[in-house]
Amino acid sequence: MEEVGVVAKISDNGMTVQASKVLEDVKLGDSIAVNGTCLTAVSFTKGEFSVDLSPETMRRTSLGKLSEGSLVNLERALLASDRMGGHIVQGHVDGTGRIMSIKTDRDSIIFRVRVPKRLNKYIVEKGFIAVDGISLTVVQRGASSFTLAVIPYTRENTNLSAVSIGDRVNLEADILAKYVESLLER
């Protein structure tokens, strides 16, 4: 996650996002993840870029719930020469979860997220999960939810600073877990 942008405009099939860092070397057709959803920059200016949103993207992600002024997490595609500071996040959202509770534990913020049953099997304690494109570690897994402990730096430098109980968030399960499942099913 490189920066927090602001949704400037929404249309029936796309949106425009205000940004700066992710636009430093952008070219038409480049991938920019918005809340963990890999999207294609179809136009850009010095301070904003536009993307198209397919019906599948609208069904599978929480992007359809955004409004003008919404804060969104932004990240360019990883280069082979970059450091990987988390786990592999592809920008291929598996589904959405819903924020069930937000509590504090000393300096950390504890989020409980309801997860769709079909995704819960990929979630393991101390394993990875991408929430709105943020690589995070699962603290605890329940029958239909999981918890995350978010440090102040992460909350203040992502859209988690604006998340409320009931909000939908994009979830991407660990790709390695999905590959293992696919291999075992053969």
Write out the residue ranges for each language-model feature.
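Conserved loop->alpha-helix
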Residues: M1-R186
